Regions:
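N-terminal ordered "arm"
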Residues: 2-46
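Structured domain cores in non-transmembrane regions
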Residues: 33-99
Length: 99
């Protein structure tokens, strides 16, 4: 039996982080890039630091051994996540082999 984790990213508010707060959100990465962007904007709007604008990807789940950079484009994150959501562990192994 294979385990399946929906690819997701933890995006942190850097303004909050730099001021001693841990504020961020786990976001489903297997969606359109604009939807990821909207979720990040909502997370920033709820930040304990007013007018927060900067973010970074601090953690990922469901991407196998693939490395997701902290400033990876939402388009790239979305493409990888959609592929992995569709193909699971075998898809992760293929991507890992060719990266």
């Amino acid at each position: 039996m294979t385990s399946h984790t929906t690819p997701r990213i933890y995006v942190a508010c850097l303004s909050a982080y730099n001021n001693g707060y841990l504020h961020g959100a786990w976001i489903d990465a297997a969606q359109e890039p604009w939807a990821i962007y909207d979720a990040v904007r909502a997370m920033l709007a709820a930040s304990p630091i007013a007018a927060a604008e900067e973010w970074a990807i601090h953690d990922v789940e469901g991407f196998g051994n693939l490395r997701i950079e902290k400033y990876a484009s939402f388009e790239r994150v979305s493409q990888l996540a959609v592929f992995l959501a569709e193909h699971g562990e075998i898809g992760a192994a293929v991507l890992d082999h060719y990266s």
